Amino acid sequence: MSKTHFGFESVEETEKAKKVAGVFHSVASNYDLMNDLMSAGMHRAWKAFTIAQANVRPGFKVLDIAAGTGDLTRAFAKAAGPTGEVWHTDINESMLRVGRDRLLDKGVVTPSLLCDAEKLPFPNNYFDVVTVAFGLRNMTHKDAALAEMRRVAKPGGRVMVLEFSKVWEPLKKAYDLYSFKVLPWLGDRFAKDADSYRYLAESIRMHPDQDTLKTMMEQAGLDAVKYYNLSGGVVALHVGSKY
């Protein structure tokens, strides 16, 4: 059986899926609060930039993968309007449930679906925009997931990946201190769960850097791939087109 990584730990591929599921079952109820605390609210700016770059218009079909608590889904549903079609999807039932409930609380009625990004249950050439925010690094077969995202995008459509990335070198020492000391402390203090936030820090370090992910998207068949560094490379938004 093939090995992969869960944070810094080497595990069987099937074990990683179970461990990642356990992390997100654990953090689901505190997810938005912890995002605000960990990023000092910056995650809202990163998502706002992604929403602006997506440029969703009335009538668009949009797939939001690893959509979690539904921040992007809600914005896309508003932009696509009643003639559009926006799917809120996640592989984790706890995250999907929290997101679905919050969307309904905001008056957003849109389909929520439990699904695996590596085996998307959608037809070829269907979506104008496909997005995944802070989800790709948790996927076991990132290449398969990227290929699936391209498959379901329409010709002329775009695939967008918002993810933690490699910080600029002058920031690295302070960022490492924050990641491996402060994040687990915040997790323990506010969510009673240091281990899940230790995994977060480790998973970020194991994720491909900006240029490597760009190459992976090109190898998945996407064209004109580019990326935007945000907050000194703490996060990067990659955008690829399907021609």
From Swiss-Prot:
Encoding gene, per UniProt annotation: ubiE
This protein's pathway: Quinol/quinone metabolism; menaquinone biosynthesis; menaquinol from 1,4-dihydroxy-2-naphthoate: step 2/2; Cofactor biosynthesis; ubiquinone biosynthesis
Keywords for the protein's UniProt record, in alphabetical order: Menaquinone biosynthesis, Methyltransferase, S-adenosyl-L-methionine, Transferase, Ubiquinone biosynthesis
Native organism: Burkholderia vietnamiensis (strain G4 / LMG 22486)
CDD domains: AdoMet_MTases
Function statement: Methyltransferase required for the conversion of demethylmenaquinol (DMKH2) to menaquinol (MKH2) and the conversion of 2-polyprenyl-6-methoxy-1,4-benzoquinol (DDMQH2) to 2-polyprenyl-3-methyl-6-methoxy-1,4-benzoquinol (DMQH2).
Gene3D superfamilies xrefs: Vaccinia Virus protein VP39
Pfam families cross-referenced by the UniProt entry: Ubie_methyltran
Top EC category: transferase
UniProt binding sites for S-adenosyl-L-methionine: T69, D90, D116, A117
Protein name (database record): Ubiquinone/menaquinone biosynthesis C-methyltransferase UbiE
